[in-house]
Amino acid sequence: MKIKAKEIKNLLSKNILADGFDVVIDLDKSHGSWIVDHRNGDEYLDMFSMYASGAVGYNHPYIVENQNILGKLAINKTTLSDIYNVYYADFLEAFDKFAVPDYLKHAFFIDGGSLAVENALKTAFDWKKRVNLNKGIKKDGDKVIYFNQSFHGRTGYTLTLTNTSDPRKTMYFPKFPWFKVDNPKLSFPINDEILLLV
């Protein structure tokens, strides 16, 4: 590529909110949990895994070894609901063997965390409504408790559950009257007042 690493942030800022770190990740040289800065070759231990978007690390040997198959899967959606393929079946066979408990045999695959949270909420709403109807309760059961300082995405339902450091990002979006509670956490420095809370 002809773009110089030191020009990347300025180039991106022309079209996106480029308020991320100054480090420019070298996708070829980064490895394991180490990010290599494309600008100067410095290495940084990744302690935040791109907010869980990069939890496997960088250039995992098994993934690199199988990049031809992964490339094929990247350009063709494999988890189609109406027509199937060998890669989907192979994955689901392994998934069922190692990750599916006997009491949760059904799977539903979705593209991304926000949409997964949305579908979990819809499942919970449906379940609660059915429980209430079976008990003769007319209420919908559509209330949710969530934590302060949480991030669950910026799609419909998840927007209410997400706290943002910049309220301008969501101030005109409709939200639900759900219940926000403080998340359990330890604050530093630890003193006698903090220890009383533990």
Residue ranges and their predicted role:
Residues 22-31:
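Short loop/turn motifs at secondary-structure junctions and domain boundaries
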